[in-house]
């Protein structure tokens, strides 16, 4: 985190502005706890999702690689409240280059740990994978519930937002796209 002390001061001032007493027993360590939490939740600001693809292997595989149901949480940059859900990340290797499966989950994790929009999160994961491996195709789907729609405003708990990014063959070929969507939904 850039400046933990500054975050602590901001939380202290926020509590005061809300009419709370930051010196009372229950709130005494809250600024420090919140700053520590934000350091963890926003740790992706100092990392690039593309850099997670450190394990690249020479392996001939010309069929889809899909990691489904990758749980994540992030913070809506508009309200600084959580959104969370599942990411599904697929790629079609272009010859003899594959990556470790955990690297797909790590890219999701890094992209999610920052003030974020779901649309951007989806694109950042897809772009990182495309740039790291240069596969024939990439397809990323993110399903999430946004607390900004659950706790405030319209108050619609349980509603989910789905975003997708298709690159390469999954953008160009309708049949390939249908196949990957079927795999993501059916299993």
Swiss-Prot record:
Enumerate the Pfam families for this protein.
Answer: GTP_cyclohydroI
**PROSITE patterns named in the record:** GTP_CYCLOHYDROL_1_1, GTP_CYCLOHYDROL_1_2
Entry binding sites for Zn(2+): 76, 79, 148
Q: Which GO terms describe its biological process?
A: one-carbon metabolic process; tetrahydrobiopterin biosynthetic process; tetrahydrofolate biosynthetic process
Q: Which GO terms describe its cellular component?
A: cytoplasm
Enzyme class at the top of the EC tree:
hydrolase
Q: Which reaction does it catalyse?
A: GTP + H2O = 7,8-dihydroneopterin 3'-triphosphate + formate + H(+)
What Gene Ontology terms describe what this protein does at the molecular function level?
GTP binding; GTP cyclohydrolase I activity; zinc ion binding
Keyword Nucleotide-binding attributed? yes
Q: In which pathway does it act?
A: Cofactor biosynthesis; 7,8-dihydroneopterin triphosphate biosynthesis; 7,8-dihydroneopterin triphosphate from GTP: step 1/1
Assembly behavior? Toroid-shaped homodecamer, composed of two pentamers of five dimers.
Protein name (Swiss-Prot/TrEMBL): GTP cyclohydrolase 1
Q: What is the lineage of its organism?
A: Bacteria, Bacillati, Bacillota, Bacilli, Lactobacillales
């Amino acid at each position: 985190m850039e400046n933990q002390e500054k975050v602590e001061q901001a939380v202290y001032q926020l509590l005061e502005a809300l009419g709370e007493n930051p010196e009372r027993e229950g709130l005494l360590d809250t600024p420090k706890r919140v700053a520590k939490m934000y350091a963890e939740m926003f740790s992706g600001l100092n990392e690039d999702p593309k850099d997670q693809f450190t394990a690249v292997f020479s392996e001939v595989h010309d069929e889809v690689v899909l990691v489904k149901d990758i749980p994540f949480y992030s913070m809506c940059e508009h309200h600084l409240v959580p959104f969370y859900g599942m990411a599904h990340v697929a790629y079609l290797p272009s010859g003899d280059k594959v990556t470790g499966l955990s690297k797909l989950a790590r890219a999701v994790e890094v992209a999610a740990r920052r003030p974020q929009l779901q649309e951007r999160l989806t694109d950042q994961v897809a772009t990182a994978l495309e740039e790291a491996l240069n596969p024939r195709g990439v397809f990323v789907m993110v399903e999430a519930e946004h607390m900004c729609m659950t706790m405030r405003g319209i108050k619609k708990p349980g509603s989910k937002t789905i975003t997708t990014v298709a690159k390469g063959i999954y953008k160009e070929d309708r049949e390939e796209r249908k196949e990957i969507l079927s795999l993501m939904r059916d299993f």
